[in-house]
Amino acid sequence: MQRFANKIAVVTGGGRGIGQEIARALAAEGAKVAVVSRSESSCGKAAEEINADFPGSCTAYAVDVADHAAVQELSKKIGDEIGAVNILVNNAGVTRDGLLMRMKEEDWDTVLDTNLKGAFNTVKAFMRPLMKAEDPRIINIASVVGIIGNAGQANYSASKAGLIGFTKAVARELSGRQVTCNAVAPGFIKTDMTDELTDAQKNAVVGNIPLGSFGETKDIAAMVAFLASKEARYITGQVFAVDGGMTM
Ligand SMILES: NC(=O)c1ccc[n+]([C@@H]2O[C@H](COP(=O)([O-])OP(=O)(O)OC[C@H]3O[C@@H](n4cnc5c(N)ncnc54)[C@H](OP(=O)(O)O)[C@@H]3O)[C@@H](O)[C@H]2O)c1
């Protein structure tokens, strides 16, 4: 079944990890996908890899989502080059971990600017086409730490909690146009981001996951694809934890 035939999607942070898997899942079911990431090499490589399996599905765009003007320009470019967007996935995210006592102002600003302001920038830039689109969807990738917090991640937890509040406000504001807006809150997923953890930290984390292991990027992509589908039309303003039971 091609759930996304004739659909156009934008996936930020699509160059690696969870975002690349989301782009692949949407492309596999017929979507044309704009793969957006910070560096040209990363989004270019991701698009090339997905195009090898699903020819012509992906176009790469190197843009910093924290840059408001650049995201406005990106929206225009995607509109001209691919078409009007139906699905926006805000997945770009960074960490700058450290205990609050040692956290620098720039660590706070970088994380909030990317993870939270980045979503504000893209929703502002793409909301007009979304409001006119068929089956319009916004899906924000939050985190379980935006729900339960995490020592050493005050900046990241605040950005993800903010993203959850933003999700609910956007869901209410755009509901009249049938645009749904939901958040997915991953637990610990195997990507470059979690590769930074030491083995001792990984073991401690796994001890707190009822299902007993880190998740895979496919676990998140499957949830995003469902929320992006026609079948999810009556779901909005919700947060779905995909976390092996961590937050139950
Ligand atoms: N992995 C986990 O366990 C986990 C858990 C909970 C939530 N999440 C969230 O899931 C999302 C994806 O995580 P991941 O683990 O796949 O991360 P990742 O492997 O570190 O990849 C992050 C992606 O975001 C892009 N990105 C970062 N800053 C950007 C910016 N300013 N503008 C545009 N793109 C930017 C990166 O671009 P480049 O490739 O060009 O550098 C990269 O493609 C993030 O929002 C993260 O917070 C992850």
Residue positions per predicted region:
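Conserved glycine-rich cofactor-binding loop
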Residues: 8, 15-17
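The beta1-alpha1 cofactor-binding region of Rossmann-like NAD(H)/NADP(H)-dependent oxidoreductases
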Residues: 40-41, 62-74, 105, 219
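Substrate-binding pocket helix/loop in short-chain dehydrogenase/reductase
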Residues: 99-100, 104-112, 194, 205
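Active-site helix of classical SDR
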Residues: 123, 159, 167
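Alpha-helical segment proximal to the catalytic Tyr-Lys
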Residues: 128, 172-176, 233
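C-terminal substrate-recognition "lid" of short-chain dehydrogenase/reductases
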Residues: 135, 213-242, 247
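Residue(s) in the substrate-gating loop at a strand-loop-helix junction
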Residues: 143
